[in-house]
Amino acid sequence: MKKKIFYFSTLFITILCLFICIALNDHIYNFNAENVVKNIKYLSSSSFEGRRSGSEENILTSEIIKNKFKGLKLSPYKNSYTEEFITTCPVKTDETVYFKIFNDNESEYLKYGEDYKEDMINFKSNSFTFSNKDKINIFSTSIAVSNDEGTLLFYLAQNDDLSFRSSFMCELRFDLVIALSSNGYNKIIDALKAGKTLNVYIPFKNEAKKLVNIQGIIEGSDPSLAPLLLTAHFDHLGSDSQNNIYYGALDNASGTSFLLELANTLSTLGKPKRSIIFVALNAEELGLKGSSFFAENNYFDIKNSKVINFDMIGVENCPITFIQGVGFKDNSSNILNSLSNICLNDSVDYLVEYENSSDHASFNELGIDALTICHSDKSHIHTPTDTVDYIDSNAINTVYKVVNKEIKKDCYSTVTTFI
């Protein structure tokens, strides 16, 4: 009799648990790559004008992400959804770009976008007047000018393509950097030889701005376990002097949208064993400023954490690339080993690279086990053609399947997935 009671009790509990799991599973949000694509399209639309750090559009993007975190019921990390920091940003002025070559008898203007175009590297000085009386070094692919106004670098654009725009590097020794076509290069050389004066004005300046990272957390059940960090940067390059927008769909509306969809999914699961921190990082294009601040400001809370950063997700027929910092190459990385094994077991093509090319580097430099997951297709990166048209939902799903297995293994048990 006791055996029958035990048997039926066990059977009842098993069936009850099964029904509970099924009921709870109905409330689990399933990751949807098409929603990621829709959000990429939205964040990389002309309304956001390239999301340049320090711009109104960058602020708008941060507010949208913050409200999304709130809507998903993520808790504020350290009692706040925002982490403020101050850094130097490229700021657009209201003036008109020009490049004038003249002497007492004649003048001409170089054509913006055909002969020359500013690179976004630095704007310590945005106006230069120079001639062959100044210190000028001429090379086959560059011209360096130095006078009382500062230092100016011209460089010859590859294949005369002026569409590429570099990340901002205000620590660079050159105060202004301008890309030239071969025609623009030759016109400058000819003008200097003829003793003419050259005057260029670029409508950007350096300015200190208050920026924010956006942060949220799903609290874990075991505070002794180091949290898992999931990150992506939401800033991009803005627009150039004639308002051509650098949309930044792959770089990195894709990683931001992937992070938001992942947060949507994980927020509907049960309580994880370890806490999961979501951070939408700012100012990656200014030299990893947002991630550097977050890593240093929160070091003692995350020093034993693993960090997965998403940067450029969604390229068709492109292997997943796991990127770690140059100085981290000789370190043992649990997160790299684990993700690599998942790819091997699931026959997913992947590569491993060591570059300080994204926000993982800020964590690696502090000895924190971090990597970036990336589809490393650079054919449209930092050009106005980086649009949603080149985003592939199947590639997004492939990344999700790999990441999902890692997160479930690291943060959840079979039971806590549902409870």
Model-based region annotation:
Residues 4-75, 218-219:
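N-terminal hydrophobic or amphipathic helices/low-complexity stretches enriched
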Residues 25-31, 46-56, 83-87, 173-175, ...:
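Second-shell loop/turn segments in exported
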Residues 164-246, 268-269, 273:
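Soluble metallo-hydrolase cores and metallopeptidase-like ectodomains found primarily
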Residues 281-379:
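Metal-dependent peptidase/peptidase-like ectodomains
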Residues 379-419:
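His/Asp/Glu-rich mid-to-C-terminal helical/loop segments that flank catalytic regions of hydrolases
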